[in-house]
A protein has these predicted regions:
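Tandem repeat scaffolds
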Residues: 1-191
Length: 191
């Protein structure tokens, strides 16, 4: 995995935890049951790649491109995605643990977050226009100066979003989620 470029390769049960990978390109590759915990990817590129059942906790994507990359049932805890290269940044998440991660200043329009744990995730100055948070746990996640226009929170839970600090035009919320929009006002809402 360190002497690429790699195209249409399948990587299964690879353990590169706490390793450093430099200037590698992976295109149309699949990673299954791999351990990349605390791995440092520097100046790498992942294009049209799929990660399934992988541990990527505390990975450092230092100036690394994630271009149309899907993560399914992966552990992605404590990742600072702001270190990723911004050019064509495009990711999707399903059944993932994203707790304690940060997406500072990322453009993530239409990003699907499906059935994810997102406890204490930081969204600051992020464009999440039309993003979908389907069945996500957003307990103590912070949204600061984000664009959430047309985002879908209808099945998300435990979120707190300040409407005065975020753009929410045409965002979708369920009636049960209204308390998360009014929390700062100390209003008791009963259903």
């Amino acid at each position: 995995m360190t002497s690429g470029p790699y195209d249409h390769q399948v990587f299964d049960k690879i353990d590169l935890s706490e390793q450093t990978i430099l200037k590698q390109e992976y295109q149309n590759c699949t990673f299954t049951n791999c351990n990349f915990s605390k791995t440092v990817f520097t100046n790498c590129s992942f294009i049209d790649c799929h990660f399934k059942d992988c541990n990527l906790s505390v990975v450092n994507f230092n100036n690394t491109g994630l271009k149309t990359v899907t993560f399914a049932n992966c552990k992605l805890m404590g990742i600072n995605f702001s270190h990723c290269n911004d050019f064509l940044f495009n990711v999707s998440f399903k059944d993932c643990q994203l707790d304690y991660s940060s997406f500072f200043k990322k453009k993530m329009q239409k990003t699907p977050f499906l059935q994810c744990s997102m406890k204490e995730v930081q969204f600051e100055q992020v464009d999440l226009t039309q993003a979908v948070f389907k069945d996500c746990n957003l307990m103590e996640a912070s949204f600061t100066n984000t664009i959430l226009e047309k985002a879908d929170f209808r099945t998300a839970s435990y979120y707190t979003i300040d409407p005065e600090m975020n753009k929410l035009k045409k965002a979708k919320f369920s009636q049960s989620g209204l308390a998360g929009l009014l929390a700062k006002y100390g209003i008791d809402i009963e259903f």
